[in-house]
């Protein structure tokens, strides 16, 4: 004869579900907010300010690059960040 026990076991505590990360293809991408405590600055130009505008479901940002030619400017994206660097080519 077989016996079965129906001991109740406590389920392990589960972490709350992770929030969906925003990406440029996400419906929530337009809810981007710049932190109030950190103004938009550019390390290569101390105190230099940029400008970001919301245009419908897109963003436009401007950076003063007048000292550089187009081939000196490098734009990369990674992890929901855009990086604009300028390096003078010899």
Curated annotation (Swiss-Prot):
Q: List each copy of the sHSP domain by range.
A: 39-90
Task: Please describe the organ and tissue distribution of this protein's expression.
Answer: Found in both cardiac and skeletal muscle.
As for subcellular location, the record says: Cytoplasm; Nucleus; Nucleus, Cajal body
Listed A to Z, the keywords are: Chaperone, Cytoplasm, Nucleus, Stress response
Q: Which domain of life is it from?
A: Eukaryota
User: What would be one Pfam family of this protein?
Assistant: HSP20
Q: Does the keyword Nucleus apply?
A: yes
Recorded GO molecular functions are: filamin binding
The record's annotation in InterPro entries points to: A-crystallin/Hsp20_dom, HSP20-like_chaperone
State any GO CC term.
Answer: nucleus
Q: How does it assemble?
A: Interacts with C-terminal domain of actin-binding protein 280.
Q: Which family does it belong to?
A: Belongs to the small heat shock protein (HSP20) family.
Query: Which PANTHER family does the record match to this protein?
Result: HEAT SHOCK PROTEIN BETA-7, HEAT SHOCK PROTEIN BETA-7-RELATED
Q: What is this protein called?
A: Heat shock protein beta-7
| Organism of provenance | Rattus norvegicus (Rat)
Lineage summary: Eukaryota, Metazoa, Chordata, Craniata, Vertebrata
């Amino acid at each position: 004869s077989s016996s079965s026990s129906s001991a109740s076991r406590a389920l392990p505590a589960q972490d709350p579900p992770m929030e969906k990360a925003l990406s440029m293809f996400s419906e929530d991408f337009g809810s981007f907010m710049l932190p109030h405590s950190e103004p938009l600055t550019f390390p290569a130009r101390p105190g230099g300010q940029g400008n970001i505008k919301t245009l419908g479901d897109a963003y436009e940002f401007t950076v003063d690059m007048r000292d550089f030619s187009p081939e000196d400017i490098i734009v990369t994206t990674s992890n929901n960040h855009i990086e604009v660097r300028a390096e003078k080519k010899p």
